[in-house]
From Swiss-Prot:
Negative results: has no effect on voltage-gated sodium channel Nav1.8/SCN10A (in complex with SCN1B). Belongs to the sea anemone sodium channel inhibitory toxin family. Type I subfamily. Binds voltage-dependently at site 3 of sodium channels (Nav) and inhibits the inactivation of the activated channels, thereby blocking neuronal transmission. Possesses the highest efficacy for the insect sodium channel para/tipE (EC(50)=5.5 nM), and has effect on Nav1.2/SCN2A (in complex with SCN1B), Nav1.4/SCN4A (in complex with SCN1B) and Nav1.5/SCN5A (in complex with SCN1B). Also interacts with sodium channels in cardiac cells. Shows lethality to crabs. It comes from Bunodosoma granuliferum (Red warty sea anemone). GO terms for cellular component: extracellular region; nematocyst. Disulfide bonds join 4-45, 6-35, 28-46. This is Delta-actitoxin-Bgr2a.
């Protein structure tokens, strides 16, 4: 899937490593968690 920015990645996506995986269908899979607290985005930003 596409990469997305977790809260722990820093305030901007420029020059930072995107450690999350964008999950569009439903919630994050089992064993993963949503690593994005807030913001206008589609789906969930999931991380193992």
């Amino acid at each position: 899937g596409a990469s997305c920015r977790c809260d722990s990645d820093g305030p901007t996506s420029r020059g930072n490593t995107l450690t999350g995986t964008l999950w569009l269908i439903g919630r994050c899979p089992s064993g993963w968690h949503n690593c994005r607290g807030s913001g206008p985005f589609i789906g969930y930003c999931c991380k193992q």
